[in-house]
Regions:
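Catalytic cores of peptidoglycan-degrading enzymes
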Residues: 4-144, 149
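Short, solvent-exposed mixed-charge patches
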Residues: 151-153
Length: 153
């Protein structure tokens, strides 16, 4: 299950769901989140998995797809460079590529998707869970208390 943020600095520029398409100017469903940052910003695998595809895909540009098991998949688009290959095993936190503006893009950003059984789902809940877990673990490490809700990493 995706449980960390795909980039260190999370500056969301486009949410999941319906929005005005920047190329067509009409309302269209956006199947992921757009996270802005400088070209070359490291992109991290948000969970352990196997690379399904690492290639150019129309619209997405340089694209990485990670299969996490249990029909969960994450997709990373518009990369400037890919750091993985199809069939490679990756671990949560591994650098899988670098932010860019390839494909159908208006500027440097990461397009991040989570899919379950092939259907896009809102990645926001996964990112919120990652942030809350991080905050709990940091507070637990700083305070003289026991960690609750999972192992401290």
């Amino acid at each position: 299950v995706p449980s960390i943020n795909p980039v260190e600095s999370m500056r969301l520029t486009s949410q999941y769901g319906y929005r005005s398409d920047p190329f067509q100017g009409r309302r269209k469903n956006h199947k992921g989140l757009d996270i802005a940052g400088p070209i070359g910003t490291p992109i991290y695998a948000t969970a352990d998995g196997v690379i399904g595809r690492a290639q150019w895909v129309s619209g997405y540009g340089k694209y990485v797809e990670v299969e996490h098991g249990n029909a969960i998949q994450t997709r990373y688009g518009h990369l400037s460079a890919m750091n993985v290959y199809s069939g490679q095993r990756v671990h949560k936190g591994d650098i899988i590529g670098f932010m860019g503006s390839t494909g159908r893009s208006t500027g440097s950003h990461l397009h991040y998707e989570v899919r379950i059984a092939g259907e896009p789902v809102n990645p926001t809940s996964f990112l919120e869970a990652a942030t809350k877990t991080s905050n709990i673990l940091i507070a637990s490490k700083d305070a003289d208390s026991k960690s609750v809700g999972g192992p401290a990493e």
